[in-house]
Amino acid sequence: MKILVVDDSKAMRAIVKRALSTLDRVAGATIIEAVDGKEALGVIEAESPDLVLSDWNMPEMTGIELLQALNEAGSAPTFGFVTSESTPEMHELAKTHGARFLVSKPFTPESLDQALAGAL
């Protein structure tokens, strides 16, 4: 399994990677990174990840813009948000565009694992 973590915060990418490393569900997964949606598009094309975990608000291209671009290209991998943005409207928008989950920051490895259980 290959997982792409997309976040403009290097520290947050490290936190997500650390949480993933504790989960049996994704044991042995290769974890790759991108700093925003624009970079993620290239990484997705080159690496074909099985799962994308994206922040919502990022420079260049937001997480929802990334998901929309993937949908338009017909190549959206399993996609979920790990973000501090968590309004009911954002949950609905994420769901409408095919995101499998939205985990709010701060999160625990257990809450991430529960979200992944419904997506993988």
What are these regions (language model features)?
Residues 8, 105:
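A Lys-centered signature of the CheY-like receiver
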Residues 33-42, 63:
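Helix N-cap/capping motif at the beta->alpha junctions
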Residues 65, 86-101:
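Alpha4 helix (beta4-alpha4-beta5 surface) of REC/receiver domains from two-component response regulators
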Residues 107-116:
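C-terminal output helix
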Residues 10-32:
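Two-component/phosphorelay signaling modules centered on CheY-like receiver
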Residues 42, 64-75:
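Short amphipathic alpha-helix used as the core "switch/output" element in two-component signaling
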Residues 55, 83:
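Active-site residues of response regulator receiver
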Residues 58:
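Receiver (REC) domain active-site loop signature in two-component systems and cognate sites
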